[in-house]
Amino acid sequence: MASAVLGLTLRWVMFLSAVLLLLLPGASAQEPPGVGCSEYTNRSCEECLRNVSCLWCNENKACLDYPVRKILPPASLCKLSSARWGVCWVNFEALIITMSVLGGSVLLGITVCCCCCCRRKRSRKPDKSDERAMREQEERRVRQEERRAEMKSRHDEIRKKYGLFKEQNPYEKF
């Protein structure tokens, strides 16, 4: 089970690496820092997003400065379904959903791994009720052995008293 989860997690890591490699070329071709984002308004999305500090609004073909003080651009600036950042083919809604699913999957994978490890650790060590049952069984066995030895000694005394004691070598009498 843990190897399946590990394989699944490894696949997600490879998938995320591939996505990052796809996003990297768009982020690496940056414009010089002196150029403002508003100069790329009414041009193309690719030209606007060459500068990583720019945000392309597909709705009105505007290139805007990314609001760095907020994580997501406000709806007054541009709708999330129309906002593009990094690459032109991914909008913010899809990005948020994808990142949420990936984050949830990673958390779920970690939780499953932790639960599996805890279960294995617990199953290796007997719990208190099992230990108590084993201890009681051992005590009963010891008491039974004591009673058996006591009964054997009583029987041997009775045999000795009446001369029925079994000797080690029955041919010794002759």
Swiss-Prot record:
<dbReference type="InterPro" id="IPR016201">
    <property type="entry name" value="PSI"/>
</dbReference>
<dbReference type="GO" id="GO:0031398">
    <property type="term" value="P:positive regulation of protein ubiquitination"/>
</dbReference>
<comment type="function">
    <text>May facilitate PTTG1 nuclear translocation.</text>
</comment>
<keyword id="KW-0597">Phosphoprotein</keyword>
<keyword id="KW-1133">Transmembrane helix</keyword>
<dbReference type="GO" id="GO:1902254">
    <property type="term" value="P:negative regulation of intrinsic apoptotic signaling pathway by p53 class mediator"/>
</dbReference>
<feature type="glycosylation site" description="N-linked (GlcNAc...) asparagine">
    <location>
        <position position="42"/>
    </location>
</feature>
<feature type="transmembrane region" description="Helical">
    <location>
        <begin position="94"/>
        <end position="114"/>
    </location>
</feature>
<keyword id="KW-0472">Membrane</keyword>
<dbReference type="InterPro" id="IPR052304">
    <property type="entry name" value="PTTG1IP"/>
</dbReference>
<keyword id="KW-1003">Cell membrane</keyword>
<comment type="subunit">
    <text>Interacts with PTTG1.</text>
</comment>
<dbReference type="GO" id="GO:0005886">
    <property type="term" value="C:plasma membrane"/>
</dbReference>
<feature type="coiled-coil region">
    <location>
        <begin position="127"/>
        <end position="163"/>
    </location>
</feature>
<feature type="region of interest" description="Disordered">
    <location>
        <begin position="126"/>
        <end position="155"/>
    </location>
</feature>
<dbReference type="GO" id="GO:0043518">
    <property type="term" value="P:negative regulation of DNA damage response, signal transduction by p53 class mediator"/>
</dbReference>
<feature type="modified residue" description="Phosphotyrosine">
    <location>
        <position position="171"/>
    </location>
</feature>
<keyword id="KW-0175">Coiled coil</keyword>
<feature type="signal peptide">
    <location>
        <begin position="1"/>
        <end position="29"/>
    </location>
</feature>
<dbReference type="GO" id="GO:0002039">
    <property type="term" value="F:p53 binding"/>
</dbReference>
<keyword id="KW-0812">Transmembrane</keyword>
<keyword id="KW-0325">Glycoprotein</keyword>
<keyword id="KW-0539">Nucleus</keyword>
<dbReference type="GO" id="GO:0005634">
    <property type="term" value="C:nucleus"/>
</dbReference>
<keyword id="KW-0732">Signal</keyword>
<feature type="topological domain" description="Cytoplasmic">
    <location>
        <begin position="115"/>
        <end position="174"/>
    </location>
</feature>
<feature type="glycosylation site" description="N-linked (GlcNAc...) asparagine">
    <location>
        <position position="51"/>
    </location>
</feature>
<feature type="domain" description="PSI">
    <location>
        <begin position="36"/>
        <end position="89"/>
    </location>
</feature>
<keyword id="KW-0963">Cytoplasm</keyword>
<feature type="topological domain" description="Extracellular">
    <location>
        <begin position="30"/>
        <end position="93"/>
    </location>
</feature>
<dbReference type="GO" id="GO:0006606">
    <property type="term" value="P:protein import into nucleus"/>
</dbReference>
<protein>
    <recommendedName>
        <fullName>Pituitary tumor-transforming gene 1 protein-interacting protein</fullName>
    </recommendedName>
</protein>
<dbReference type="GO" id="GO:0005737">
    <property type="term" value="C:cytoplasm"/>
</dbReference>
